[in-house]
C-alpha cells in the first residue's frame, strides 16, 4: 500500500513538473478605497512596459462590472513556464525602475490592498493551446 501511494505521488508530481507549454497567471488586485484610477495609471504608464523587460507577456486587463467588484483590477500574464514566471517576478521586484515607480505611486499611502494569483495551463481544447 505504501509503495502504491508513493508511486501515485511521484506520478502526480512528476506530471506537474513535466508540463510543457506556456503558463498563464491570473492576478486579482484590490486597490485601497478610491485608488483604482491610480493603480490603473501605474500599469498604463509604467508596469506593463517593465513587465515586458522581464519576459512577462500581458494577455489583458479587466475591471468587474458587478457592484462588489469596485476597486478591483484583474489581469492575465503569459509565461514560458512556472520557473520562468518565478524568475521574471524576482527580476521585476529587483528592477530599480519598478522600485522607484512603486515608491512614487505609494508616497501618500499604499494604493494596493490585496493581491491574489492563480497559475493555470490551457486545456487541450482551449483556443490558447
Where are these regions (language model features)?
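Bacterial N-terminal signal peptides
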Residues: 2-12
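An amphipathic, aromatic/His-enriched active-site/gating alpha helix that lines ligand/cofactor pockets
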Residues: 19, 41-59, 78-123
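Active-site-flanking beta-strand signature of metal-NTP-handling nucleotidyl enzymes
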Residues: 24-28, 74
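Short, surface-exposed ligand-recognition loops at beta-strand->loop->(often short) alpha-helix junctions
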Residues: 31-40
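A short beta-turn/loop motif at secondary-structure boundaries
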Residues: 64-69, 107-110
Amino acid at each position: 500500500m505504501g509503495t502504491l501511494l508513493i508511486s501515485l505521488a511521484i506520478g502526480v508530481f512528476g506530471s506537474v513538473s513535466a508540463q510543457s507549454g506556456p503558463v498563464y497567471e491570473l492576478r486579482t488586485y484590490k486597490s485601497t478605497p478610491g485608488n483604482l484610477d491610480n493603480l490603473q495609471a501605474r500599469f498604463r504608464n509604467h508596469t506593463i512596459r517593465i513587465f515586458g523587460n522581464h519576459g512577462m507577456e500581458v494577455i489583458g486587463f479587466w475591471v468587474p462590472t458587478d457592484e462588489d467588484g469596485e476597486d478591483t483590477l484583474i489581469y492575465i500574464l503569459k509565461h514560458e513556464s512556472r520557473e520562468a514566471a518565478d524568475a521574471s517576478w524576482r527580476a521585476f521586484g529587483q528592477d530599480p525602475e519598478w522600485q522607484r515607480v512603486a515608491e512614487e505611486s505609494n508616497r501618500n499611502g499604499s494604493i494596493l490592498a490585496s493581491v491574489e494569483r492563480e497559475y493555470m495551463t490551457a486545456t487541450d481544447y482551449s483556443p490558447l493551446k
